[in-house]
Regions:
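N-terminal Rossmann-like dinucleotide-binding module
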Residues: 1-25
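Short active-site oxyanion
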Residues: 5-9, 42-44, 149-150
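Alpha-helical elements of Rossmann-like donor-binding domains used by nucleotide-donor carbohydrate transfer enzymes
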Residues: 20, 34, 43, 55, ...
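Conserved SAM-binding strand-loop segment of SAM-dependent methyltransferases
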Residues: 26-34
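Structural detector of well-ordered beta-strand residues that form the stable sheet scaffold
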Residues: 30, 68, 93-95, 125, ...
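Beta-strand-loop-alpha-helix segment that lines the small-molecule cofactor/substrate pocket
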Residues: 43, 49-50, 54-101, 116
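Glycine-rich, N-terminal phosphate-binding loop of Rossmann-like dinucleotide-binding domains
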Residues: 47-48, 128
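Predominantly a Rossmann-like dinucleotide-binding segment in NAD(P)-dependent oxidoreductases
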Residues: 100-179
Length: 179
């Protein structure tokens, strides 16, 4: 529960989707351009598909809005760097998920490591398995598109962020995917 901000409006490139969201949450729906030009809006919560994150975030920054996106910030490194540079130039905040490392389990783990309760850690490992996005997601098709990244971009950042937060930058990474 976040009581320091209030979601008051929503937008989607599909008007029907924006109206559905607005109806569910009792907020006002706008077109994307209306939202970007609305002076009442201070921050954009960007929940688009990954390949659209860069474009939406850039437009929001250019319209003097702070941005918080789902992961990833951008599909390629140069676009990510460009967004960070633009936010800094305009004195705006930009952030993105995953913020799950701020949760209780990861914070307790960090406390244990910082107190040296279990000694030096030399290796981090993360394993994720599930029945597939199609088992629960209402629109799984973009997840399988070439530039969407699939499970690596969808779930990988949660585990990698936790490992980096707990253990520091990686010196070597090994990965595998099985169908």
């Amino acid at each position: 529960y976040f009581n320091n901000f209030k979601i008051i409006k929503c937008a989607d490139i599909k008007d029907k989707a924006a109206k559905k969201c607005a109806s569910i949450y009792g907020i006002k729906s706008l077109s994307v351009n209306e939202l970007l030009n609305d002076n009442e809006i201070e921050i954009i919560l960007n929940l688009t598909i990954p390949k659209a994150h860069y474009e939406v975030a850039k437009k929001a920054l250019l319209h003097n809005k702070h941005v918080y996106s789902e992961k990833p910030m951008a599909i390629n490194l140069n676009h990510g760097k460009e967004l960070l540079k633009l936010a800094k130039k305009k004195k705006l905040y930009i952030g993105n998920a995953p913020d799950t490392f701020l949760g209780g389990g990861n914070q307790k783990s960090k406390e244990i490591l910082e107190n040296n309760s279990i000694g030096k850690i030399n290796l981090g490992n993360a394993i994720f398995a599930f029945p597939g996005i199609q088992s629960y997601h209402p629109n799984p098709e973009p997840w399988f598109a070439k530039k969407e990244g699939g499970p690596v971009i969808d779930m990988g950042p949660y585990y990698l962020t936790a490992l980096v937060n707990l253990l520091g930058p990686a010196k070597e990474v090994i990965g595998s995917i099985m169908k």
